[in-house]
Design a protein with these regions (language model features):
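S-adenosylmethionine/decaboxylated-SAM
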Residues: 1-176
Length: 176
């Protein structure tokens, strides 16, 4: 399956996924897919103050799509796709347009309630059996990710797990 990162920002996580894909699945058709604003100027209008605060902190200095593609070309990695804009809309478009594809790893790093909840609604059914959804800011004060995850999982029999030794990701689930 594909690796999807929601919240690419400066690209360090995205480049890690690309390198791991090259090492462990060099002949695979699986893609590394990134969702972020990139150069797109349309920003979401959040209801919650904490979400607005987090967006303001991350509203600058992210990597451009051009630079991300250029670096991946240098590494001879072409199995990537980028979606620019509001993740609430772009993840919905991806889910609609990627018939038959599955996600092996979904990494959520959007830092906010509304985006996290919509990503889970849009992409959960695209997850492969045995796939992993990892949460970068679960249980961190000032980020709405925890509330969104708890709300989404409230009617599902899924147990959240964590690494006691890791600062991030703070939680993950394995799809059965």
């Amino acid at each position: 399956g594909d690796i999807c990162e929601c919240g690419v920002f400066k690209g360090s996580g995205f480049f890690t996924w690309v390198k791991l894909m090259k090492i462990f699945k060099p002949n695979s058709d699986s893609k590394v897919i990134g969702f972020d604003f990139f150069e797109n100027k349309s920003k979401p209008k959040f209801k919650y103050k904490s979400d607005k605060k987090v967006l303001a902190l991350h509203n600058k200095d992210g990597i451009s799509q051009k630079d991300l593609f250029k670096k991946c070309e240098e590494w001879n990695f072409k199995n990537l796709k980028l979606y620019a804009g509001d993740v609430k809309k772009t993840t919905k478009k991806y889910a609609r347009d990627s018939l038959g594809s599955r996600i092996a790893l979904l990494y959520l790093d959007v830092d906010n309630y509304e985006g996290t909840l919509e990503i889970l609604k849009n992409l959960y059914n695209k997850m492969a059996k045995g796939g992993v959804i990892a949460f970068d800011e679960y249980a961190l004060q000032g980020h709405g990710e925890s509330d969104a995850v708890d709300e989404f999982l409230s009617n599902k029999k899924i147990k959240l797990k964590s690494f006691s030794w890791a600062k991030t990701p703070t939680a993950y689930i394995i799809i059965k």
